[in-house]
């Protein structure tokens, strides 16, 4: 099986400070993968590169392929980047909605990558596209809010609108950057339930950066742990031990771990970690 996402020898430097070191990663179709690590570990930087929103180093920067096509290499984005972005749904931590537009209009924006630019700029969406957008809103439990301005919604509701937009985009790969970081536990659970449902029932590949490890244990069969721009672990989430996680997060202490008794027992019953080699 060919990888849906292939990262090969990725390096990234910001103002002479290297942020990513020779990262190698393959993700198969239909996987749900958590990228975990402390703040500044490189997980969001990695995700932005996979989305084509950031460029790797020009010298020895490595390459990234998505859906079997070259996205970028050695600091240059592929000529196919616009078409590839149409297949990549990106969910931002801060929702990235247009507050002055209605909820429905925000979801319709997901179609822009697959329609002529002149039609998109004029907002000429078809009746079928509007039907699909309403269907996507119903799936995330927000059909009744279609006519409201996006700015009137809570943070959790706005994040669900962003997911509905990715559904209308018909993306094969969904990348979610800290989608629950600013949400209360109930809103976070709803967002993760929806992402898991899309992965399970639609077969979409989902990669999500998470600070809260208990959500990675609960929702993502595979975890990739980063520290200082290097991959330290890549494997089953069940194999993450509390000792390793305490070392991974260091001075941040217990805050991101949030182990439930069940999660803690599951992690502690697993064999010792085998660290990935960067």
UniProtKB/Swiss-Prot annotation:
It holds the Pfam family ABC_tran. It is a peripheral membrane protein. Keywords: ATP-binding, Cell inner membrane, Cell membrane, Membrane, Nucleotide-binding, Phosphonate transport, Translocase, Transport. It catalyses: phosphonate(out) + ATP + H2O = phosphonate(in) + ADP + phosphate + H(+). One of its GO terms (cellular component) is plasma membrane. Its EC number is 7.3.2.2. Residues 5-253 form the ABC transporter domain. ATP binds at residues 37-44. GO terms for molecular function: ABC-type phosphonate transporter activity; ATP binding; ATP hydrolysis activity. Belongs to the ABC transporter superfamily. Phosphonates importer (TC 3.A.1.9.1) family. The complex is composed of two ATP-binding proteins (PhnC), two transmembrane proteins (PhnE) and a solute-binding protein (PhnD). Part of the ABC transporter complex PhnCDE involved in phosphonates import. Responsible for energy coupling to the transport system. This is Phosphonates import ATP-binding protein PhnC 1. It comes from Pseudomonas aeruginosa (strain UCBPP-PA14). The lineage of its organism: Bacteria, Pseudomonadati, Pseudomonadota, Gammaproteobacteria, Pseudomonadales. The gene is phnC1.
């Amino acid at each position: 099986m060919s990888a849906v996402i292939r990262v090969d020898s990725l390096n990234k430097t910001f103002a002479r400070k290297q942020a990513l070191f020779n990262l190698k990663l393959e993700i198969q179709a239909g996987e749900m993968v958590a990228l975990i690590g402390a703040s500044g570990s490189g997980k969001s930087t990695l995700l932005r590169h996979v989305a084509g929103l950031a460029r790797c180093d020009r010298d020895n920067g490595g390459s990234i392929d998505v859906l079997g096509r070259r996205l970028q290499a050695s600091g240059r984005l592929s000529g196919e980047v616009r078409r590839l972005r149409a297949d990549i749904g990106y969910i931002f931590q801060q929702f990235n909605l247009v507050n002055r537009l209605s909820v429905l209009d925000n979801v319709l924006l997901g179609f822009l990558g697959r329609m002529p630019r002149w039609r998109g700029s004029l907002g000429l969406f078809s009746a079928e596209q509007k039907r699909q957008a309403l269907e996507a809103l119903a799936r995330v439990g927000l059909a009744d809010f279609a006519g409201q301005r996006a700015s009137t919604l809570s943070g959790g509701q706005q994040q669900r609108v962003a997911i509905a937009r990715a559904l209308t985009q018909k993306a094969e790969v969904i990348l979610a950057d800290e989608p629950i970081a600013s949400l209360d536990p109930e809103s976070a659970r709803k967002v993760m339930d929806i992402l898991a449902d899309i992965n399970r029932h639609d077969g979409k590949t989902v990669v999500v950066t998470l600070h809260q490890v208990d959500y990675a244990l609960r929702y993502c069969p595979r975890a990739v742990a980063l520290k200082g721009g290097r991959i330290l672990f890549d494997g089953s989430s069940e194999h993450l031990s509390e000792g390793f996680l305490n070392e991974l997060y260091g001075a941040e202490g217990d805050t991101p771990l949030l182990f439930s008794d069940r999660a803690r027992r599951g992690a502690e019953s697993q064999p010792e970690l085998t660290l990935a080699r960067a």
